[in-house]
């Protein structure tokens, strides 16, 4: 399975003991993801949804959100 889409480059070198443990857990998690195809698809979905969410937040000025609370109120 191709897991090259998992980008972990922004995380720098470990400078504290707790970060070393976090790195071990992160490496274990990414190795688990790489050999489980279902998890890989889920993570791809999360990755794509995050990108879409970021794009929609960036374009928020172009859209006007309609408040739904007025429709839920009982008179």
Curated annotation (Swiss-Prot):
Keywords: Phosphoprotein
A biological process from GO: viral RNA genome replication
InterPro entries in UniProt: PA/PA-X (IPR001009)
GO molecular function annotations of the record: RNA binding
Keyword GTP-binding: no
Highest taxon listed in the record's lineage: Viruses
Pfam families from the UniProt entry: Flu_PA (PF00603)
Processing and modification events after translation: Phosphorylated on serines and threonines by host kinases, including human casein kinase II.
Family statement drawn from the similarity comment of this UniProt entry: Belongs to the influenza viruses PA family.
Quaternary state and interactors: Influenza RNA polymerase is composed of three subunits: PB1, PB2 and PA.
Function statement: Implicated in endonuclease cleavage of capped RNA primers. Displays an elongation factor activity in viral RNA synthesis. Dispensable for viral transcription, but not replication.
Name this polypeptide is given: Polymerase acidic protein
Species in which this protein is naturally found: Influenza A virus (strain A/Camel/Mongolia/1982 H1N1)
């Amino acid at each position: 399975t191709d897991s090259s889409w998992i980008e972990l480059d922004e995380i720098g070198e470990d400078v504290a003991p707790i970060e070393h443990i976090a790195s071990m857990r992160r490496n274990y998690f990414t190795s688990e993801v790489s050999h489980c195809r279902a998890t890989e698809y889920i993570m791809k979905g999360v990755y794509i949804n995050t990108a879409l969410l970021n794009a929609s937040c960036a374009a928020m000025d172009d859209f006007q959100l309609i408040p739904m609370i007025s429709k839920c109120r009982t008179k």
